[in-house]
Amino acid sequence: MEEIFDKLQAVADRYDELNELISDPEVIADSQRFMKLSKEEGSLRETVEKYNEYKEVTQTIKDDTEMLREESDPDLVEMTKEELNEAKERQAQLQDELEVLLIPKDPNDDKNIIMEIRGAAGGDEASLFAADLYNMYVRYAEKQGWNVEVVDRNETEVGGFKEIALIITGDQVYSKLKFENGAHRVQRIPATESAGRVHTSTATVGVMPEAEDVDVDLDPKDIRVDVYRSSGAGGQHINKTSSAVRMTHLPTGIVVAMQDERSQQQNRAKAMQILKARVYDYYQQQEQSEYDAQRKNAIGTGDRSERIRTYNYPQNRVTDHRIGLTLNKLDKIMAGDLEEIIESLIIADQAQKLEQLRNE
């Protein structure tokens, strides 16, 4: 526990430093820095409050133990023993709570997300499954009270999606959907399969936190913008005007094309929103070793090629391979009942991080 208390003291010292900084007129004048530091201060507050309470309770235990050695009055001894037992119970409770609070927090957990769903291996059936996943996430978002906005789509002739991109906004969206990153495999009999054979197809899901200006600063000189005529729906008007936009971030080579909106201005805004998220995601992977480790852990939140889940329609079964969870309610899950899977993933991730914390 000594290492944990060293970490707690470091958190308390940083909290005091932050309180001084956000009272500094120079920091207050810099709105972006002030917001960033205030957010950090708020994230540490509960930990510091519980740590201070832990120190008070520990002192109470020390004082009561000393008093019992010296006190002879029976009533006072009884009262002190009662107080000591309560203090020890509270100390143990606070110790458990502080360990959980020390688990490294994902700075993106409270962010909105950009989700990209693509049909992968399996042709038309993969595109249809991509559409099924889209509907599943929309229904889950509705249950959470979140808002879903489709910003780009590439539909297939059979009613599926080669690719669909959406922005999901609301409370703690990334914290709940970040574990959806990866390859989702479906096993079912396609409608066109006359022999009744089960086919296996795959769709990939990418989840990126929506980047704020404070997170990523894109230099306009680093962005090449091309405009061209949209090939999407919209009749004569959309083909006569150069409303589609392609943005290239030159330092990383990341390209975003947007033609879903009617006007070039709207497409520019959406393309920039997605470009920021992709660049932010790219730099987090490249530059932060801690973030890299988190993305490659046993729970898995990063690699889109990693097979994370299988949806078996004939047996009405869903299996999450990362935590060995199998649920026989595929019909409900596809209707947006994802809570049990998501909560299980969050608990497994926290348990793993707590184990790492104890072993450090």
From Swiss-Prot:
The UniProt entry, under InterPro entries, shows: PCRF, Pep_chain_release_fac_I, Pep_chain_release_fac_I_sf, Prokaryotic/Mito_RF, RF-1
Q: PTM N5-methylglutamine: list the residues.
A: Q236
The UniProt similarity line reads: Belongs to the prokaryotic/mitochondrial release factor family.
Q: Which PANTHER family match?
A: LD18447P (PTHR43804:SF7)
- Where can this protein be found? Cytoplasm
A Pfam family the protein falls into: PCRF
Q: How is it modified after translation?
A: Methylated by PrmC. Methylation increases the termination efficiency of RF1.
Protein's UniProt name: Peptide chain release factor 1
Please name the Gene3D superfamilies in this protein's record: 3.30.160.20, 3.30.70.1660, 6.10.140.1950
A Gene Ontology molecular-function term?
A: translation release factor activity, codon specific
Gene Ontology cellular-component annotations: cytoplasm
Q: What are the UniProt keywords, alphabetically?
A: Cytoplasm, Methylation, Protein biosynthesis
